[in-house]
Amino acid sequence: MGVRLLYIVDPLDRLALAGDSSYALMLEAAARGWGVWTCQIENLGLVGDDAVCDAAPTVVKAATRPAEAFQTEPLAPHRLADFDIVLMRKDPPVDVNYLHATWILEHARGKTLLVNDPRGLRELNEHLAVLHFPHLTPPTIVTRSAARLREFQAQQGGAIVVKPEIGRAHV
């Protein structure tokens, strides 16, 4: 087997395959004859300074449903350094578990190719990043002040969308 890739992803049975870039990347890797392994962030860990994971060899096929697209073998222990490329593809929210995963990935730096740099994932907030492109965003306010939110809502003339800076809102 040629190139060995580890995809750190959401549970495979929850991927929306149509338009999912992680799935497209896995399909292309499979088409090239490369080895695909998958794991979730809770499968990452450290042994001393060595980043490790429990990952499943994964056969990827073109399909419309995850049950048809993925065939996985049982999880087995691996060092991240044993993979040629490690792709952090876990969707936000950026929560404590996500942050811990990026800290673990830092221990693989220089030992394998990390796609989606862990430092960059931590530093670029998913909700604030879009504000670098004001011509593409609706009027926006970032605040912890309820009074400012009410004032902004009045200025906008009604309903607004409110999101937490980190994680997901619990409704």
List the predicted regions and their residue ranges.
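Active-site nucleotide/adenylate-binding loops and adjacent lid/helix of ATP-dependent enzymes
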Residues: 2-31, 36-170
